[in-house]
Structures are given as C-alpha cells and as structure tokens.
Amino acid sequence: MDTLDGTAFRPRRAKTRMRKTLLALCAVSTLLTGCAGNPDNTNGTLTGEGATSQQNAINLFADVLIREHGLNLAYNATGSGAGVQKFLESVVVFGGSDSPLDADEAKRSLDRCKGHPAWHLPLVISPVAIAYNLPGVDGLVLTADALAKVFKGDITKWNDARIKKLNPGKTLPDEHINVIFRSDKSGTTDNVQKFLAYTAPKVWKADAVGKVWQG
C-alpha cells in the first residue's frame, strides 16, 4: 500500500481464525468534541462517549481528575459515530471521534452548545494499518490503487493479475477476498476513505468519504 508520500509499504497480517480476509483499520488523530461555552456539569461526573481508540488515554485522565479535583469521568467507548450523536443529543458532555464534525454536525452543534461552536481537541495519535488474513502468505504488498480496487470490488480474488504483479514469487490462492468493514458510523472509516481518495483518486472519488463505508 502507498503512504501519503507515495512510497509503498506492506499491510499487516492479521493473526486470527478468520481466513482470507482484508480488514480496513485506521485511527489517525482522535479528537474530543465539546462545547466552547459553559460546561454542562462542573461537579460530580463528566460523561463522554465515542471512539474506542481514546479509551486508554481517557482512563489516565480520569485517574488525574478524581485524584486532583475530585471529579469523576465516565466514558463509554462505543465508536465515533455513536459518540458524536450522543453529544449532539446532549446525552453526554463530550464526544470522542477519529474525525472532526462534518458541516451538518457542526451546524447542529450550535444548538447543542447554546449558540457556541463545538471545540475539537486533538487527543491521541494512533497508527494507520490495513490488516489481511491469508494463511501462508507473509509480507503482502499492495499499492493504494490496488487496495482501492479491492475495496470497490474491481479486484475480487487474491490471485488477480494486478496483485500477483506486485508480489512476484508469492503463491497467491484462487480465493475470493472477503472485505470486512464497520457497519456503523465510524471516524476510522472516514480516515480510511480519505486516505484512499487522496492516494488513489482515479479509483476512489473525492466524495466517497465520510463515516459510512462507501465501498
């Protein structure tokens, strides 16, 4: 697969029981989204919901808050889409997301925050990876173009000539590629699709992005 500067690298092989699968995994800069005006609650418990990638960091923050300020922090790691939705519905004080609010969400946040804009606070930097599970094949190489064609359904088998050309000397099976992706709204999905749109624009169109999978 290509990096953003155009160089190639290898997807990570996923060591699971699932066979012959390709998974889209991504988390770049995860964010906390909250109101810029007066907080909903300055005593007792701060509630948040969202990206699982932030869970460990928020656990550390929670330890500091209770120790230094006597304030509890409760975070429900259900995914970026759910976190943003619960924030906009005023169910939680802040939402965690792997991608910022889109234009519609930002507009809705003005009502949520009583006329104030929502703040995006960069919180965690996490790696981006494409994982695959193909027993007996290590060090698989894919370009961004080939990867986009897999996710679009233009390449459907592991021994497709375009994949074989990128992996000389490797024995690739005549098996269908099963693409696995998030079914819910996900900031991870948004980041993967933005990567594909940037690195393989002839295959993955610029408008095929967002928290819902477009492949």
Q: What are the residue ranges of the model-derived segments?
A:
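N-terminal segment of the mature folded domain
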Residues: 38-164
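Flexible glycine/proline-enriched surface loops and loop-helix/loop-strand junctions
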Residues: 133-135, 170-179, 209-215
